[in-house]
Amino acid sequence: MPKIKTKKAAAKRFKKTGSGKVKHFHAFHSHLLGHKTSKRKRRLRKSAIVSKGDMKIIKKILPY
C-alpha cells in the first residue's frame, strides 16, 4: 500500500507543534484593514491552535 500524500496547500498553512497540536494563522489580515479596529488587527496577527472539531480533517491531509 502506498504512502498517503501530504496536501501541499495545507502544509503551507499549518504547522505541527512539538506536543502534536496544529498551529495556523488568522485570515482577514492582508488587505482592507482601514475599517478594522486596532484591537482586531492586533489579535489577527497572532497564530492560533486548530480546534478539536477540525483536527480530524487536518490529520488526514497532513499525515506526516
Swiss-Prot record:
InterPro entries, alphabetically? Ribosomal_bL35 (IPR001706), Ribosomal_bL35-like (IPR021137), Ribosomal_bL35_CS (IPR018265), Ribosomal_bL35_sf (IPR037229)
Q: Which Pfam families match?
A: Ribosomal_L35p
Q: Which domain of life is it from?
A: Bacteria
Q: Output one GO BP term.
A: translation
Q: List the disulfide bonds.
A: none
Question: What keywords are assigned to this protein?
Answer: Ribonucleoprotein, Ribosomal protein
Its cellular-component GO annotations read: cytosolic large ribosomal subunit
Protein name per the record:
Large ribosomal subunit protein bL35
Classification of source organism: Bacteria, Bacillati, Bacillota, Clostridia, Thermoanaerobacterales
